[in-house]
A protein has these predicted regions:
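An alpha-helical interface "stripe"
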Residues: 2-180
Length: 180
């Protein structure tokens, strides 16, 4: 555990990061991040392969090499139209291929306990530290980002009280004024 007197932001960030890795989270890889769509496509398609391979094969049969871009477009449309929280609980559907994908599995939506719990446990939680979410010379970054199945669900910006920063002001201002 972090020493009490060490109140800097980086050791605290690293402590959170290490704790989550030690408790089942995966490390996110920069190379898997799709900046244009704000998704970790590596974790996204790993989740789909692990939980819905038949549906994914139908999508591949319909779209060939473009199946990933088609799914990403459908997912982004769903999130844009319905909002992230609603989208996480609904299906992503492609009518041309006749496919329906669950974005995540929740304990409350489990139909059959054994099968449902197995699917729930295949959710992929990942974490990135010093996460830059845009490609430009001086990109915005957050201290930590948490993803569920490749979808960013939590951004954490740590503040140091000893440096005069206040999370209620500095963090809020930073997210409202300097983030897209």
């Amino acid at each position: 555990i972090m020493a009490e007197q060490d109140l800097r932001e980086n050791p605290f960030r690293d402590e959170i990061y290490t704790y989550l890795l030690d408790h089942g989270y995966c490390a996110g890889e920069r190379s898997d991040y799709d900046y244009a769509h704000a998704l970790d496509t590596g974790k996204l398609f790993a989740f789909l392969e692990a939980t819905q391979p038949e549906e994914l094969n139908k999508l591949k049969a319909t779209y060939g090499d473009r199946y990933q871009s088609r799914y990403i477009d459908l997912l982004c449309q769903k999130i844009d139209n319905r909002g992230l929280l609603t989208a996480l609980n609904e299906w992503v559907e492609d009518y041309a291929s006749g496919t329906k994908f669950q974005i995540a599995y929740f304990k409350s939506s489990i139909k059959s306990m054994s099968e449902g719990l197995a699917l729930y446990e295949k959710n992929i939680f990942s974490i990135r530290r010093e996460f830059t979410f845009e490609q430009k010379k001086d990109p915005y970054r957050v201290d930590l980002a948490i993803f569920l199945n490749g979808i960013p669900i939590v951004m954490i910006e740590l503040k140091k009280q000893t440096a005069g920063q206040k999370a209620s002001f500095e963090g809020t201002k930073q997210f409202r004024m300097t983030r897209n």
